[in-house]
UniProtKB/Swiss-Prot annotation, chain A:
This is Protein Wnt-2. It comes from Caenorhabditis elegans. GO terms for cellular component: extracellular space. The keyword Disulfide bond applies. InterPro entries: Wnt (IPR005817), Wnt_C (IPR043158), Wnt_CS (IPR018161). It comes from the Eukaryota. Expressed in intestine, pharynx, anterior body wall muscle, vulva, some pharyngeal neurons and SMD head neurons. Expressed along the boundary between the intestine and muscle or hypodermis, but is also expressed in the hypodermis in cells including seam cells. Palmitoleoylation is required for efficient binding to frizzled receptors. Depalmitoleoylation leads to Wnt signaling pathway inhibition.
C-alpha cells in the first residue's frame, strides 16, 4: 500500500511540473526561434515545445517572420528590464532553472506589463522589417498623409508598416489564448486578461506613431522635405506602458465569462469601463522579496542596491529590511580616449575603486 | 515495485534537461539590431579615396541604409569637385559615412573647427549659385574635443619658402573650371613667361570669353598672389617655353589682373568639356540652372516599395 501511494504522488507531481514548465516557457520558446533558424539546434524550427498547435502552423507558414518575433521579444525584455532597474521586480530572467524570459504564474500587474510590452515588441520589429524589405509578404506602409503635415511637404518615403505588424502579432500571439490546449487547464480569465494586455501593447504602438520628415537636396532652409509615418522607439513604448502599469486596473471574471471592473474599482475611479490601452490584472502582487518557486518570484537576495537612497533601489526598500553587505570593487576602464586620423582610438587605462552594496 | 519511482524520476530529469539544452543555445542567437559597420561602397563617390573603409549605419544624417546615404550624397558631389577647401571630403564623408570602430559605440563626429574651416572656404561659393549653407551641415551641433575629426594639418613649408599660390594649386574638375570662368574677367589659352617672383606675363594668348573669340592678347602682366610682397612658387610642369596654359584672372580696382587659376592645357575629358562649355555658358543664369537641376532629381524618399503580396493568415 505505501509504495503504491508514493508512486502515484510522484506521477502527479511530475505532471504538474510539466504543465507549469510548458506555460512558463512560452516566451522562452519565442526567444529560441531564431536560434533554431540559425541552425544551432537540431530540433525542427516549428516544433519547439512552447508553441501551441495553432502557433506551430503559423510558424510553418511564415518562417521568415520568426527571427523578427524572436528579436522583437528580446528587445521588449531589454526595455522591460530598463524600466524596472533597481526595483524588486526587475523583469529578470530565471537562468537557474534554464528558462528564459519573465515568468508569471499569477495574474499580476507585472504580468500585464510583460505581456503588453512583448506584444508591442513583436509588432514593432515586424513593422520595421517590412519597411526594410526583409519580409516577403509586406513592404512600406500604405498610410495616407495625416493632416498635421504641411501641405507643401511631400508624403512618401517608406514608412514602418505597423498595420501588418499589428495583424501578424495579433494572429500569432493571441491564437494561443484562444485555443483549448489539452496539456493545460483552460483558464478563461487569464486568457482574456492576456489578450487584453497584448492588445493594449499593440494599440499603444499604433496610437503613438508620428510623421518623420527628412530634408533632402542642398537646401539651406530645409524647405524641401519628405515625410512618412514612423513608429515610436521601444524606449518611448516602455515609458508609456510604465505609466499604464502604475495605473493598471483590477478586473475579475463575471458570470457570463467576460472581464469586468471590480465594484470598488469602478466606484473609486468613477468610470464604468477601462480604456482599450489600459492594463488589467486580477491578482495582487507578491512583495517579490523572497525566492518562491510556487509564485515564480526570484527574491532580492544578491541584488545590488544603493545605500542611503530613498527610492525603490535604496537598500532599505530593495533588501526588504534584511540588510546588505558592502564589498570593495576595483574596476579597470578606458579613459582619456583620443581619436587619431586615420583611424583609431587611443585610450589610457584607469583604475577605479568603488564600493558595492549587495542585499543579504 | 521499486522500479516505478526510478522511472518517474528519470522522466522528470529528462524534461528539465530538454529545457536547459534549449536555453543555452539561445546565447548564440541573432543579436538585436543596433548601429553596425558596413563597407563603404565605391558608388558613395564623395568618399572615394578616403583613408578608412568601413562606415557606421545609421550615419550622422540619420540615413538608415547604404542606398539612402548614396542617394543623398550625390547632391554634394558638385560641392566636393568645386574644391573650395582641402578638407571638404573629410568633412562630408564624416557625415555621410562616419568612421566605424568595432570596439566602441560612440559616434566619431567632425570637430567644430573642421566644420568652420570648410564652411569658411565654401559658403561664399555656394551662395554664388543660390545655395546658402544648409541646416544639415550647421556647425553649431559639433564640438572640439579629443574624440572628433580634426582639420588636416597643413604640411610645414621648408624654411625660406612660402606656400604654393592658390591660383596654381587648382583642380581641373568641370565644376571648378566653370566656377572660376564665371568669376574671372580674363580667360586665356596662352604661353606665359615667369618674369618676376610675383608675376607672370602673357607672351601670346587667345581669349576664351564669349564674344571675344580669337581676340589676341599679349604683353599682359598678371599678379600671382593677393598678398603684398607675396612671392609664391608656381610650379607648373611646363616642358618648354611653348607649352600652353589655361590662365584665368580677375581685374582689380586698380585695373591690374590677379590670377585665379593657372593650369597646363590638358586633353582630359572633363577639361575639354569645360572649355567647350565656355562658349555657351551664361554666367548670370548658371546658379538658377544648378538649383533647378538639383530639384529635378527624383528623391530617394519618393521611391516607395509597395507590398509584394497581400497578408493572409489562412
Amino acid at each position: 500500500m505505501i509504495p503504491r501511494r508514493s508512486c502515484w504522488l510522484i506521477l502527479l507531481l511530475n505532471l504538474l511540473n510539466v504543465q507549469s514548465l510548458l506555460d512558463a516557457s512560452w516566451w522562452s520558446t519565442v526567444a529560441q526561434l531564431s536560434t533554431a533558424l540559425a541552425g544551432h539546434n537540431v530540433k525542427p524550427v516549428c516544433e519547439l515545445p512552447g508553441l501551441s498547435p495553432g502557433q506551430a502552423q503559423v510558424c510553418e507558414l511564415f518562417k521568415d517572420h520568426m527571427p523578427a518575433v524572436s528579436i522583437g521579444a528580446q528587445n521588449a525584455i531589454q526595455e522591460c528590464q530598463r524600466q524596472f532597474t533597481g526595483h524588486r521586480w526587475n523583469c529578470s530572467t530565471h537562468y537557474s532553472t534554464g528558462m528564459l524570459g519573465p515568468i508569471h504564474k499569477m495574474a499580476t500587474r507585472e504580468a500585464a506589463f510583460t505581456y503588453a510590452i512583448l506584444s508591442a515588441g513583436v509588432t514593432h520589429e515586424i513593422g520595421r522589417r517590412c519597411k526594410q524589405g526583409l519580409l516577403t509578404s509586406c513592404g512600406c506602409s500604405d498610410e495616407t498623409k495625416p493632416k498635421n503635415v504641411p501641405t507643401d511637404w511631400s508624403w512618401g518615403g517608406c514608412g514602418d508598416n505597423v498595420e501588418y505588424g499589428y495583424k501578424f502579432s495579433r494572429d500569432f500571439i493571441d491564437i494561443r489564448e484562444k485555443e483549448h490546449d489539452p496539456k493545460r487547464n483552460h483558464d478563461n480569465g487569464r486568457s482574456l486578461m492576456n489578450r487584453r494586455n497584448n492588445e493594449a501593447g499593440r494599440k499603444i504602438l499604433k496610437r503613438h506613431r508620428k510623421p518623420k520628415c527628412k530634408c533632402h537636396g542642398v537646401s539651406g532652409a530645409c524647405n524641401m522635405k519628405t515625410c512618412w509615418m514612423q513608429l515610436p522607439s521601444m524606449e518611448q513604448v516602455g515609458k508609456i506602458l510604465r505609466n499604464k502599469y502604475d495605473k493598471a486596473i483590477r478586473v475579475q471574471i463575471n458570470d457570463r465569462g467576460n472581464l469586468q471592473l471590480l465594484a470598488d474599482e469602478a466606484t473609486k475611479e468613477r468610470k464604468t469601463r477601462a480604456l482599450p490601452t489600459d492594463l488589467v490584472f486580477m491578482d495582487d502582487s507578491p512583495d517579490y522579496c523572497r525566492f518562491d518557486r510556487h509564485s515564480g518570484t526570484l527574491g532580492t537576495e544578491g541584488r545590488v542596491c544603493k545605500r542611503g537612497s530613498g527610492g525603490a533601489e535604496g537598500c532599505d526598500s530593495l533588501c526588504c529590511g534584511r540588510g546588505y553587505n558592502t564589498y570593495t570593487q576595483e574596476v579597470k576602464s578606458k579613459c582619456n580616449c583620443k581619436f587619431e586620423w586615420c583611424c583609431k582610438v587611443v585610450c589610457q587605462t584607469c583604475n577605479n575603486v568603488t564600493q558595492v552594496d549587495i542585499c543579504k | 515495485m521499486m522500479l516505478f519511482p526510478v522511472l518517474y524520476i528519470l522522466f522528470a530529469f529528462s524534461v528539465t534537461n530538454g529545457y536547459l539544452e534549449d536555453s543555452w543555445a539561445m546565447f548564440s542567437s541573432e543579436r538585436p539590431v543596433g548601429p553596425k559597420c558596413v563597407d563603404i561602397p565605391s558608388n558613395l563617390s564623395i568618399c572615394n579615396g578616403i583613408e578608412y573603409t568601413q562606415m557606421r549605419l545609421p550615419n550622422i544624417l540619420e540615413h538608415e541604409t547604404v542606398s539612402e546615404a548614396i542617394h543623398a550624397s550625390k547632391d554634394w558631389e558638385s560641392l566636393l569637385r568645386l574644391n573650395c577647401h582641402p578638407d571638404t571630403q573629410r568633412f562630408l564623408c564624416s557625415l555621410f559615412a562616419p568612421v566605424c570602430l568595432m570596439q566602441m559605440d560612440r559616434l566619431i563626429l567632425p570637430c567644430k573647427s573642421l566644420c568652420m574651416a570648410v564652411k569658411q572656404g565654401c559658403e561664399n561659393r555656394m551662395a554664388n549659385y543660390g545655395f546658402p549653407w544648409p541646416e544639415m551641415l550647421s556647425c553649431e551641433k559639433f564640438e572640439d574635443d579629443d574624440m572628433c575629426i580634426k582639420p588636416m594639418q597643413p604640411a610645414k613649408p621648408p624654411a625660406g619658402s612660402s606656400t604654393t599660390c592658390t591660383a596654381c594649386s587648382q583642380v581641373a574638375t568641370y565644376e571648378n573650371l566653370v566656377d572660376q570662368f564665371c568669376r574671372s574677367h580674363l580667360v586665356l589659352k596662352a604661353k606665359v613667361i615667369r618674369d618676376s617672383p610675383t608675376h607672370i606675363r602673357v607672351r601670346n594668348g587667345r581669349s576664351l570669353k564669349k564674344g571675344e573669340r580669337r581676340r589676341g592678347v599679349s604683353d599682359v602682366e598678371i599678379r600671382l598672389s593677393s598678398e603684398s610682397d607675396g612671392s609664391c612658387p608656381c610650379n607648373i610642369p611646363v616642358k618648354n617655353q611653348n607649352e600652353k596654359l589655361l590662365v584665368m584672372a580677375s581685374r582689380q580696382p586698380d585695373g591690374k589682373y590677379l590670377a585665379n587659376l593657372v593650369l597646363p592645357w590638358q586633353k582630359e575629358k572633363n577639361f575639354k568639356r569645360a572649355i567647350h562649355q565656355f562658349q555657351r555658358l551664361n554666367c548670370q543664369s548658371l546658379g538658377r540652372e544648378i538649383r533647378e537641376s538639383a530639384s529635378r532629381r527624383p528623391h530617394y524618399y519618393e521611391m516607395r516599395r509597395h507590398n509584394t503580396g497581400r497578408y493572409q493568415m489562412f
